[in-house]
């Protein structure tokens, strides 16, 4: 089956499972050696349908959190839209993809995800932060909550209603509580007292702005955003290594 994947984490997952991916977004950068010769048809928010049609795909793969509704509505070929908003929904969607593609490796990943869901939740350790890259300022006290930051100007965080939030909670972190329905709330850092900040390396490249962050005087760390936000094979490998020590 010829697949155009508009979801970076699914692109990597499908390729590693042996599915034939014939088109991708410019953000589909993994696995590096496998994506080199796969044509780019757009980004996660916009696409050239002419380029897609030229590739003669059997299916376009979308995700409700990654791609806009218009992309599904305008898609000129059959499509499948997943909806990954938590570890639980990831397990469900992996099983669905495994069945759709009749692919045992995808089914095996869904079982791995189930193992992760059933694993005990550890105590969050601020001295051993998973996917740690660099200190903005090391914690000088105990913190009861963390805020995972994804954007600057405006400052944006994530709630527990997201896949990232689900991952953090599984790792034992207590997230800042936001109003229900606000998945990616705009926040004011100076108003967030007694909060330790995790600055993601993507989509905003906080690791390249470490000097500016240090000037704020807040305590926090830079973490690898791919580990926390790329669901599928990359996220599962990260959680297996962290939670199951496999």
Each model region followed by its residue ranges:
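N-terminal ligand-binding lobe of clamshell/alpha-beta domains
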Residues: 1-246
């Amino acid at each position: 089956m010829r697949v155009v994947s508009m979801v970076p984490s699914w692109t990597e997952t499908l390729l590693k499972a042996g599915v034939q991916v014939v088109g991708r977004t410019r953000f589909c950068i993994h696995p590096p050696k496998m994506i080199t010769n796969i044509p780019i048809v757009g980004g996660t928010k916009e696409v050239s349908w002419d380029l897609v049609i030229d590739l003669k795909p059997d299916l376009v793969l979308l995700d409700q959190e990654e791609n806009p509704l218009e992309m599904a509505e305008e898609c000129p070929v059959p499509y499948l839209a997943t909806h990954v908003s938590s570890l639980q929904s990831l397990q469900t969607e992996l099983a669905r993809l495994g069945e759709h593609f009749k692919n045992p490796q995808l089914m095996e990943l869904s079982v791995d995800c189930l193992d992760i869901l059933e694993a005990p939740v550890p105590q969050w350790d601020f001295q051993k932060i998973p996917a740690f890259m660099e200190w903005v300022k090391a914690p000088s006290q105990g913190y009861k909550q963390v805020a995972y930051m994804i954007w600057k100007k405006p400052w944006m965080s994530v709630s527990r209603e997201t896949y990232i939030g689900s991952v953090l909670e599984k790792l034992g972190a207590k997230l800042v509580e936001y109003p229900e329905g606000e998945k990616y709330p705009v926040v004011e850092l100076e108003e967030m007292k007694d909060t330790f900040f995790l600055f993601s390396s993507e989509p905003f490249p906080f690791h390249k702005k470490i000097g500016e962050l240090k000037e704020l005087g807040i305590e926090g760390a830079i973490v690898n955003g791919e580990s926390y936000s790329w669901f599928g094979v990359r996220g599962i490998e990260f959680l297996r290594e962290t939670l199951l020590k496999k």
